């Protein structure tokens, strides 16, 4: 797909896009992504492990320093950082051995959360390099902002499609990113698929390898 084709796919968020003509996968349209959440999900609880040592939680979980320390959390990503949201910050956890990362985001379809996809994912991935670490990603309810950042992490660092990532997290927690965030995850899915296609096309084919050895 050309860059022009990629832009068309981004503009029409309700149409499936196939980046790799040789593959079977198509990035779903926005409505199809929403349908993935209609399959049902686990009963809502304050915090859930959705990937080894990676948890999604809500404001109540983030404010309970005693339980966080007892559970062994070492890293906290607040996807609702700020005075009008979940107002914690590194000073709130200063008596704990916790590394804090704040993202000032509003749970609005018009908010560009994608600007934080890579920095938040890098924070999570760096933390999980040590298997002793435990990461909590939270917002107010633990369903939209925090879930979106975790989905982006799984897509960027674990090579998952947006469908794979949603299915992985939904098995463990009831999440529901707003429609604007889903569109941004869809754009990320197209971007990553294009990168994978370009990487695959840049590798020498078996025919090329055979011709050089003859």
From Swiss-Prot:
Entry protein name: Dual specificity phosphatase 29
Function, as annotated: Dual specificity phosphatase able to dephosphorylate phosphotyrosine, phosphoserine and phosphothreonine residues within the same substrate, with a preference for phosphotyrosine as a substrate. Involved in the modulation of AMPK and MAPK1/2 signaling pathways.
E.C. designation(s): 3.1.3.16, 3.1.3.48
Active site as annotated: 139
Annotated PANTHER family: AGAP008228-PA, DUAL SPECIFICITY PHOSPHATASE 29
Family: Belongs to the protein-tyrosine phosphatase family. Non-receptor class dual specificity subfamily.
Species name: Gallus gallus
Subcellular location, record wording: Cytoplasm; Nucleus
MF (Gene Ontology): MAP kinase phosphatase activity; protein serine/threonine phosphatase activity; protein tyrosine phosphatase activity; protein tyrosine/serine/threonine phosphatase activity
One Pfam family it belongs to: DSPc
Cytoplasm recorded as keyword: yes
Keyword Cytoplasm: yes
Catalytic activity from the UniProt record: O-phospho-L-tyrosyl-[protein] + H2O = L-tyrosyl-[protein] + phosphate; O-phospho-L-seryl-[protein] + H2O = L-seryl-[protein] + phosphate; O-phospho-L-threonyl-[protein] + H2O = L-threonyl-[protein] + phosphate
Enzyme class: hydrolase
Tyrosine-protein phosphatase domain: residues covered: 46-194
Organism lineage: Eukaryota, Metazoa, Chordata, Craniata, Vertebrata
Binding, substrate: 138-145
């Amino acid at each position: 797909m050309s860059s022009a084709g990629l832009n068309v796919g981004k503009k029409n968020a309700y149409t499936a896009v196939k980046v790799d003509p040789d593959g079977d996968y198509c990035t779903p349209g926005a409505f199809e992504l929403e349908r993935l959440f209609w399959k049902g999900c686990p009963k809502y609880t304050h915090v859930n492990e959705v990937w080894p040592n990676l948890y999604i939680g809500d404001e109540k979980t983030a404010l309970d320093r005693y339980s966080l320390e007892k559970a062994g959390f070492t890293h906290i990503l607040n996807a609702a950082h700020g005075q009008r949201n979940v107002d914690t910050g590194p000073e709130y956890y200063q008596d704990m051995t916790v590394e804090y990362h704040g993202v000032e985001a509003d749970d609005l379809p018009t908010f560009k959360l994608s600007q934080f996809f890579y920095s938040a994912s890098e924070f999570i991935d760096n933390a999980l390099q040590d298997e002793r670490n435990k990461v909590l990603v939270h917002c107010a309810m633990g369903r939209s902002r925090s879930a979106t950042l975790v989905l982006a992490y799984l897509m960027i660092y674990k090579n998952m499609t947006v469908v794979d990532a949603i299915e992985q997290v939904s098995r463990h927690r009831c999440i529901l990113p707003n429609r604007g965030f889903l569109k941004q995850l869809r754009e990320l899915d197209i971007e990553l698929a294009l990168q994978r296609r370009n990487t695959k096309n840049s590798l020498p084919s078996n025919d090329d390898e055979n011709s050089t050895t003859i």
